[in-house]
């Protein structure tokens, strides 16, 4: 959210494939998990659109909570910088891929997470969701 000339990251999540299909889209069988903004670690279990919660990735067996997202500081930096390139949008969701050489933008979304993230309280430790975070910045839009 770009509010009063300052770029603020409201939330971040990782999307992951959850089937034999090589896609991470929530609407195509994928799942997601929130990322701790300070540490860049996966904050809790993942959830799919059917509201099934996964402590471990079903294909790899990797424990999700606590997994460190590579290049996290760089991810945050490029998203904050990019928000200033399109200040007229105010609220943008940045899709970022993590490659072996660092983060790369995939796309920007003007309606990010509108169909998936209402589920977030299901697996979030506080069971609250992200509305309180949005409320801090919405006045500046």
What do these predicted regions represent?
Residues 17-21, 52-53, 113-116:
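A short local loop/turn or secondary-structure capping micro-motif enriched for an aromatic residue
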């Amino acid at each position: 959210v770009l509010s009063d000339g300052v770029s603020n990251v409201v939330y971040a999540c990782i999307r992951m494939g959850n089937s034999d299909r090589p896609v991470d889209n929530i609407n195509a069988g994928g799942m997601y998990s929130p990322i701790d903004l300070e540490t860049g670690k996966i904050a809790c279990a993942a959830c799919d659109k059917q509201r099934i919660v996964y402590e471990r990735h079903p294909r790899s067996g990797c424990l999700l909570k606590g997994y460190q997202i590579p290049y996290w500081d760089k991810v945050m930096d490029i998203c904050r910088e990019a928000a200033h390139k399109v200040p007229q949008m105010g609220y943008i969701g940045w899709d970022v891929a993590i490659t072996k050489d660092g983060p790369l933008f995939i796309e920007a979304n003007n309606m990010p997470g509108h169909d998936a993230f209402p589920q977030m309280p299901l697996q979030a430790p506080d069971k609250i969701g992200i509305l309180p975070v949005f409320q801090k910045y919405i006045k500046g839009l």
